[in-house]
Regions:
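N-terminal ligand-binding lobe of clamshell/alpha-beta domains
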Residues: 1-287
Length: 287
């Protein structure tokens, strides 16, 4: 078996399933566990990813208006790697290499088609289904991994709910333009007994009117340092809310085995009286 994973979350799933030795290629975004960095890179963005969130948003929109995709797949590298399995996704054409990108690469080079596993994580349930789907495609049992993750999440949620507090939380997955976090993030928030606010593209006035108790910034693909650099867009002092930054790249917007750590990050932020800050500085910080 020879696996090429073209999504960072799928690479984590592959390794959590004990299949890391079978992975032969990765995407430009696959960076965990660290050992995968030595694998051949099979993809790249077709736009400049440097710059602030407004500039990147504009470049992505311009690229989508004129090109088939915002990513390229190196079909020559794929051909050389001779994969038996390629893992991609159909959830978001902006977030990662998509199924259509892979199909174009396969049609250009391959006469014998590898198995293509397309993940679609729109919710917590989908994340667990994707783990099982990928495990089944590779001939292993994914249920023990799902059980371990779900057990950890239930324990975190039970501790949070025991506080009997329900803070009103605004999770932001992009800074400029402002976008409220959707998909599994509202579910994580509500698992802890909190209320999740504003899950769509929004304006600053919407934030002011919502009057959240807590704001959690988790820009898609951004680490703490890069998120910190994006905080200048808005006057956070206008809010009474406590404001926090998280590593959206490694945790919050990565739907893989570390989703339980994402829940833990939210729990440490929202219920500091009940959780030791074990991930502070690594996964989150106060603004």
């Amino acid at each position: 078996m020879r696996i090429v994973s073209l999504i960072a979350s799928a690479t984590e799933i592959v390794h959590a399933l004990g299949l890391g030795d079978f992975q032969v290629g990765r995407s430009h975004e696959c960076d965990y566990p660290p050992g995968v960095l030595s694998l051949p890179v099979c993809t790249a963005p077709v736009f400049d990813t440097h710059g602030n969130s407004r500039e990147i948003d504009q470049r992505v929109k311009e690229t989508l208006a004129t090109a088939e995709s915002v990513y390229q797949v190196f079909d020559d590298v794929l051909e050389r790697l001779e994969p038996t399995h390629i893992v991609t996704q159909t959830q978001c054409q902006v977030c990662a290499v998509s199924l259509s990108d892979v199909e174009r690469a396969l049609s250009a080079r391959f006469t014998t088609r590898p198995a293509v596993v397309a993940l679609e994580p729109n919710s917590l349930t989908d994340i667990f289904k994707d783990i099982i789907r990928l495990a089944n495609a590779c001939g292993v049992d994914g249920q023990p991994l799902v059980d371990r993750i779900q057990t950890e999440m239930r324990e975190i949620a039970a501790t949070a709910r025991a506080t009997k507090r329900s803070p009103r939380v605004l999770n932001l997955e992009w800074q400029e333009p402002l976008m409220g976090a959707g998909n599994w993030i509202p579910e994580l928030t509500e698992m802890l007994g909190a209320e999740s606010l504003l899950h769509t593209p929004i304006q600053w006035d919407d934030v002011l009117n919502a009057d959240p108790d807590v704001v959690v910034c988790m820009p898609c693909g951004y680490d703490l340092e890069r998120t910190r650099a994006e905080m200048h867009w808005h006057d956070w002092k206008q809010l009474r809310a406590r404001v926090y930054l998280t590593d959206g790249n490694q945790y919050m917007t990565r739907p893989g085995p570390r989703i339980a750590k994402s829940l833990r990050i939210l729990a440490e932020i929202l219920y500091p009286e009940s959780f030791e800050p074990t991930l502070e500085g690594l996964g989150w910080e106060k603004f």
